[in-house]
Curated annotation (Swiss-Prot):
Catalytic activity, reaction form: L-lysyl-[protein] + 3 S-adenosyl-L-methionine = N(6),N(6),N(6)-trimethyl-L-lysyl-[protein] + 3 S-adenosyl-L-homocysteine + 3 H(+)
EC number(s) given by UniProt: 2.1.1.-
SUPFAM superfamilies named in the record: S-adenosyl-L-methionine-dependent methyltransferases
Originating organism: Lactococcus lactis subsp. cremoris (strain MG1363)
Single GO term (MF): protein-lysine N-methyltransferase activity
Taxonomy of the source species: Bacteria, Bacillati, Bacillota, Bacilli, Lactobacillales
Full protein name: Ribosomal protein L11 methyltransferase
BP term (GO), one: methylation
Keywords attached to this entry: Cytoplasm, Methyltransferase, S-adenosyl-L-methionine, Transferase
Keyword Transport applies: no
Originating gene: prmA
Keyword Transmembrane helix: no
Cellular localization per UniProt: Cytoplasm
Length: 317
């Protein structure tokens, strides 16, 4: 069984997205946010008993790192970077602490904060252990257990990826999901009409968890999951490629993506912090794509590129 180190930062709520991005850029294998406002604004829909808690201007952001990463040095580096943010955010009440936990404890820790969440008009992400939540109207339920795949599907980068899939999928497409993680985007693609989906992740744990999550949902027979490094060695042509991973990794796959996307097809890239968006755009455009849509939520960007000779309606076209 693997052990993991965590770094928990208590900081002003306004710094939440910036600190989350900083922790992910530092190599975090997952981030969870504990905000008292979420409890105070929560409607008791599922019969749970919530703790008594007072409103605070602070949030707790916990990031997870493999045990073999030098946690003492990493903590010092993160503290230094946070200190440089003093001109932008209040550091009153700041604390940075570390902890060690087992794989089992981490997997269970997610469950305290993971509740059903309506992500788009039609898509709701539901924890696999919440059995009494039923769909209403056009609502489609994505049942998910994040396990060790580092994502519950509610992060802004995933939300924007889902919005992007809603925009480009019309039915019958072949889709490649690069860095599938929990498998949430692949499951969503089945609901949105994709005919065939190939999901890849370099992390064997993520591959296992994605397979388990996919089996929880209808349409799982359309999804094929395997371990792979980005799109290396892949020759499957696709109408849509989606990747929600770090910007520095995205730029490594733009040439392969252009090779594999069919004419008039789309490349969706998310997981991009604001100051690296131009780098990703340049990489995709140099490969031959045109930027069609740019979505921004807080510090995060999601980009929709198109492979087309017709530049009408394309940003910069």
């Amino acid at each position: 069984m693997n052990n993991w180190n965590s770094i928990t930062i208590k900081i002003s709520r306004e710094a939440e997205e910036t600190i989350s991005a900083l922790l992910i850029e530092a190599g975090s294998a997952g981030v969870e946010i504990n905000d008292s406002a979420d409890y105070l604004n929560h409607e008791d829909q599922f019969g749970e008993v919530l703790p008594e808690i007072e409103q605070s201007e602070l949030v707790e952001i916990t990031a997870y790192y493999p045990e073999n990463m030098p946690i003492v040095e990493l903590k010092a580096e993160i503290e230094h970077k946070i200190a440089n943010l003093a001109d932008y955010f209040s550091l009153t009440g700041l604390s940075v602490t570390t902890n060690n936990l087992s794989e089992t404890n981490w997997a269970e820790a997610w469950k305290k904060y993971f509740e059903p969440a309506r992500i788009t008009h039609d898509l709701t992400i539901v924890p696999s252990w919440t059995k009494d939540y039923l769909a209403t109207g056009s609502e489609k339920l994505i049942r998910l257990d994040p396990g060790m795949a580092f994502g519950t599907g509610t992060h802004p980068t995933t939300k924007m990826s889902l919005y992007a899939l809603e925009q480009v999928l019309r039915g019958g497409e072949t889709l490649l999901d690069v860095g599938t993680g929990s498998g949430v985007l692949s499951v969503a693609a089945t609901y949105l009409g994709a005919a065939e989906i190939f999901a890849y992740d370099i992390d064997e744990v993520a591959v296992r968890v994605a397979l388990e999550n996919i089996e929880l949902n209808p349409g799982h027979e359309k999804i094929h999951v395997s371990a792979n490094n980005l799109l290396e060695g892949i020759d499957k042509k696709a109408d849509v490629i989606v990747a929600n991973i770090l910007a520095d990794i995205l730029v490594l796959m733009t040439d392969d993506a252009f090779r594999l996307v069919k004419e008039e097809g789309y490349l969706i890239m998310s997981g991009i912090i604001a100051d690296k968006a131009d780098m990703v755009i340049a990489s995709a455009e140099n490969a031959g794509f045109f930027l069609e849509t740019r979505m921004i939520q807080g510090e995060w960007n999601c980009l929709i590129f198109k492979k087309t000779e017709n530049r009408e309606g394309v940003i910069g076209g």
